[in-house]
Amino acid sequence: MATQTIDDTSKTTPKETLVGTTLKPLNSEYGKVAPGWGTTPLMGFAMALFAVFLSIILEIYNSSVLLDGIPVSWG
């Protein structure tokens, strides 16, 4: 036989907070998909810029790019 709850004290309702009330409209769009490509090209552009940024950082770290007037010493 399954256990049975005698009192309802264990059943609590969620407390409404200012943050929850503020963020609730953002969650109302959950599951909806915009037709077409949407913002995919924008995300691709952002990823390309990030890849360029990472390659520049790597070139600076490997001293492939020399920065005039800025001493770089790793050790």
Curated annotation (Swiss-Prot):
Indicate the transmembrane segments per the record.
Answer: 41-61
Q: Which domain of life is it from?
A: Eukaryota
Which GO terms of the cellular component aspect does the record hold? Answer: chloroplast thylakoid membrane; photosystem II
Q: Any idea where this protein resides?
A: Plastid, Chloroplast thylakoid membrane
Question: Does the keyword section mention Phosphoprotein?
Answer: yes
A GO biological process of this protein is:
photosynthesis
Gene3D superfamilies in alphabetical order:
Photosystem II reaction center protein H
Q: Which residues carry this modification: Phosphothreonine?
A: T3, T5
Report keywords, A-Z.
Chloroplast, Membrane, Phosphoprotein, Photosynthesis, Photosystem II, Plastid, Thylakoid, Transmembrane, Transmembrane helix
* Subunit structure of this chain's protein: PSII is composed of 1 copy each of membrane proteins PsbA, PsbB, PsbC, PsbD, PsbE, PsbF, PsbH, PsbI, PsbJ, PsbK, PsbL, PsbM, PsbT, PsbX, PsbY, PsbZ, Psb30/Ycf12, at least 3 peripheral proteins of the oxygen-evolving complex and a large number of cofactors. It forms dimeric complexes.
What the record says about family reads: Belongs to the PsbH family.
What name is this protein filed under? Photosystem II reaction center protein H
Q: What is the lineage of its organism?
A: Eukaryota, Viridiplantae, Streptophyta, Embryophyta, Tracheophyta
